[in-house]
A protein has these predicted regions:
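Membrane-embedded helix-loop-helix hairpins and adjacent transmembrane boundary segments
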Residues: 1-492
Length: 492
């Protein structure tokens, strides 16, 4: 069966459901905008987010088009071993950040009014240069991350309507820009609750449909074995998942989430420590459950659908071929939700990097909060347009782009952890660690000779070690922040 034969457009049901869904999201953004009274509301909900909002918003922002399209698409060519890409890491991706940095961030955020990652790093290291470094890095890496999500919208529109992918890219981009521009973090987190719930439902339904299409577990496994026995064993087809890469993925999608600004900021939005720990239980359950089922569906799809145009299409095609068009469209909205919930969180965070961390702290130190809020809406539109352009040109697969962007921001784990646990960490040490870390990451990723030195582990492993050494060495020979700053961060 060829790819063109697999795609069976059903545009009317798809448009009906999607327009209704996007209309609801737009209304929530408008409503949230009416309730957004100050800059604290816009960026972190004034630190009032409860258990349900915090837990679901964290996991729905962490999970993305990559989880629902890119990762299953990668697994589609690997088999069961591919599920190790993110399922094990999902267990720890809220627990580790909460235990290592969450409690302290909530306390500091409420006490000193921190709204962004740059607020924390700038204050901890007593250096406004940190704002500039973080702001530039966020623009460089988070725009591609948003672009990966919006590419997924194009894939979905193409599968369900037969229209070019750019139509879905532009449509989704406009809706997200509108509700983030008007509602900020309040709009983002309110929509995240709906989107996260829909994502869980989509994972469950897709998994069930994939089993039915494949004729049950036994038949699916028999088919996989007849196609390629490697689908059933480690390291998977083409040796994709050796033990070094397996360990890398567990650490990558759990420990290194601490360096993601859009997730880091979620701690400032939480009401208190009790809320955080309850939110961890809720969010972790949602992540593990959703990741397991949607990725397993990708494996099941190998047995029932072959020769598709793009591997990223496997989940939409399972829903399209296995369900009534209207029902399929409802659950495909869950995949759209996965992308939107990630984009909105990142877009608000990136806007904050430009308006607060670069403009208010470096360019115009006298700018009022009202001026920053007005500028934020303009910046949201500009960044959104850049993301749409990125999505239209599609420089790589959803999974590849996501992994690149995530890895780049993960370098900030070094200044964050040293800032929280080592009093002698300095601003110059932090900045040097990030710069050297980014250069090392690019070398370990792009240069085959250097990449071989990682011995099969992800580039972030040696990169983090190098960045940590740079942090320690440079800090030893540079001036520490004032004692007042140290006391403010280590006596809370």
């Amino acid at each position: 069966m060829n790819g063109a034969a697999v795609i069976q457009p059903a545009p009317i049901p798809f448009y009906t459901v999607l327009v209704l869904y996007l209309g609801i999201m737009a209304f929530i953004g408008w409503y949230a905008g009416r309730k957004t009274n100050n800059i604290g509301d816009f960026f972190v909900l004034s630190g009032k987010a409860g258990v349900v909002v915090s837990g679901i918003a964290y996991f729905s922002t962490q999970f993305s088009m990559g989880t629902f399209l890119g990762t299953p698409g990668t697994i589609y060519g690997v088999g069961y071993a591919g599920m190790a890409i993110s399922v094990p890491g999902a267990v720890f991706c809220m627990i580790l950040p909460a235990l290592l940095i969450g409690r302290k961030l909530i306390t500091l955020g409420h006490k000193y009014g921190f709204l962004t990652m740059a607020d924390y790093l700038t204050d901890r290291y007593h250096s406004k240069k940190m704002s500039g470094v973080l702001g530039v890095m966020m623009l460089f890496f988070l725009v591609p991350m948003m672009g990966a999500q919006i590419i997924g919208a194009g894939v979905i529109v193409h599968v369900f309507t037969g229209l070019p992918e750019w139509v879905g890219v532009v449509g989704m981009g406009i809706i997200v820009i509108l509700y983030c521009m008007t509602g900020g973090m309040k709009g983002a987190m309110m929509t995240d609750v709906i989107q996260g719930s829909l994502m869980i439902a989509t994972a469950v339904v897709t998994f069930i449909v994939s089993i039915v299409m494949g004729g049950g577990f036994s038949n699916i496994n028999h088919t996989l074995q007849s196609m390629n026995e490697a689908y059933l064993t480690f390291p998977g087809a083409n040796g994709y998942m050796p033990w070094t890469y397996y360990i890398s993925n567990i650490v990558l999608w759990s420990f290194f989430t601490m360096g993601q600004p859009h997730l880091f900021t979620k701690f400032f939005a939480m009401k208190d420590h009790k809320t955080m720990f309850k939110a961890i239980l809720l969010g972790t359950a949602g992540m593990f459950f959703s990741a397991t089922l949607i990725e397993w569906a990708g494996v099941n799809g190998i047995a029932s659908i072959q020769n598709i145009e793009k591997a990223d299409q496997i989940i939409p095609m399972i829903l399209q071929r296995g369900m009534n068009p209207f029902l399929a469209s409802i659950f495909i909205a869950g995949i759209v939700a996965a992308g939107m919930s990630t984009i909105d969180g990142i877009l608000v965070t990136t806007t904050g990097a430009v308006t607060r961390d670069i403009y208010q702290k470096i360019i115009n130190k006298n700018a009022t909060d009202e001026a920053v809020m007005s500028l934020s809406k303009v910046v949201t539109v500009i960044i959104g347009i850049v993301v749409i352009c990125f999505g239209v040109f599609q420089p790589g697969s959803i999974f590849e782009i996501n992994l690149f962007a995530f890895s780049g921001m993960a370098i900030f784990v070094v200044p964050i952890l040293f800032g929280i646990y080592w009093k002698k960490a300095t601003a110059k040490g932090a900045i040097a660690s990030v710069i050297v870390g980014i250069i090392s990451l690019l070398l370990f990723t792009l240069n085959p000779s250097v990449k071989a030195l990682a011995m099969g582990f992800h580039a972030l492993f040696p990169t983090t070690i190098i960045a940590s050494i740079v942090m320690i060495v440079v800090s030893k020979f540079t001036k520490t922040p004032p004692q007042e700053t140290i006391d403010r961060h280590f006596t809370v």
